[in-house]
Amino acid sequence: MEFTDVFYNLENEKQFLAEIDELLTIPYEKNELEIGVSKFLSFINKYGEPYLITEFQLQRCMEKFLNSPLYQLDENAVLSIFYDCFFFLKEQQTLKFIIIVFQSEIQENEYCLRLLASTGFIPVLIKAMKQFKDRSENVAFTSFRYALFLVYYICRSRRLSPTDLVAIDEYFLVNLFKTSEEAWNDEDMDSFGMCVLTLLSINEQFMLVRLASKGSFEIANGIMDLLSSSKVDNGIYSEGLVFTLNREKDPRSRMLILKQLFLLFTTPATYEIFYTNDLNVLIDIFIREINNIPDELSDLRYAYLQVLIPLLENTQVRHPPHYKTKCIVDAVNNVLISHSKSSNMEDARTTDVAIRVLEVPWLQQEMKSLGTAQ
């Protein structure tokens, strides 16, 4: 697709928006769609910078576009044109606009999701994101957050190919950790949460590819490699995981956090990256959730119990003075009582993991002292 060069003499934002409206309402036939999209993107690229600075301005322009006759003539065809453009365009202004459209449509448009989830898009998106990571540049960082959402949404929708995963390199991950640290320090919880969810989704992808490979090939888990080293502040990340788990309601997001915690608590280099106070808060969360999770979320209850074992065995909570031992034992015993008489396979699995929690050596000693040994 070739961009067309048309000169406009714009003096203010009102004129810019008027030209946008005019471009988007030009009548086209379906076979002329690419011409209309080309004219629009060319205009955005050449004249957008003074008038597409804030998130509000970007959102307003996007809404005009999505509600326009040009887009509604054939939404999927326009998305395909945007997708093709994304692979060869280098102009930041145009890339930012395409990203915000994708971010809006991927949640509602199944075709958009299939398009972006195809192998090859993630590497190009990661490359574009490296231009937008500066939090001091508001519009660039807004585009970075939208692109992060795309990575997160694609990761939660399908298993990434090895080619896609390799593109998520150390440089990108280090900067994503640093961005999350800056957001945490600035108390920007929305940006921090998006960074953490994306890191958790990428971590899950590394876990999936390892399971699928069965030793035939090896792709190192870049998240765990960084957390095991001194290249990122794992203290902020671990504190943020506790913060997020304590407030998160979405079962899928909680499961992502639990998968990350399981890896951290079963990898010797990361056994003790959590502060003891944060571990105590984690124990409070686990007690609360094990007691309160409804039966329809039995997989989530099982995950909490499964992660509780290495938490008790490998982290510094294994050393006295132990925190809320009786509450831990009572919560696990409640699970055993409610599941022990069931013949359901899921209940049997939950019972097995609950018994394994109570077999943690120091917990057994504490139970004897409390007179509650099984």
Swiss-Prot record:
Q: Which GO terms describe its biological process?
A: actin cortical patch assembly; actin cortical patch localization; Arp2/3 complex-mediated actin nucleation; endocytosis; protein localization to actin cortical patch
Q: Give the UniProt subcellular location, in the record's own words.
A: Cytoplasm; Nucleus; Cell tip
Q: Name one GO cellular component term.
A: mating projection tip
Q: Which domain of life is it from?
A: Eukaryota
Q: Which UniProt keywords apply?
A: Cytoplasm, Nucleus
**Would I find Protein biosynthesis among this entry's keywords?**
no
GO MF terms on file?
Arp2/3 complex binding
Kindly indicate whether the keyword Nucleus belongs to this entry: yes
- Where is it mostly found? cytoplasm
Role this protein plays: May be involved in protein-linked oligosaccharide phosphorylation.
Q: Which family does it belong to?
A: Belongs to the LDB17 family.
Q: From the Swiss-Prot or TrEMBL record, give the protein name.
A: Protein dip1
Organism this protein belongs to = Schizosaccharomyces pombe (strain 972 / ATCC 24843)
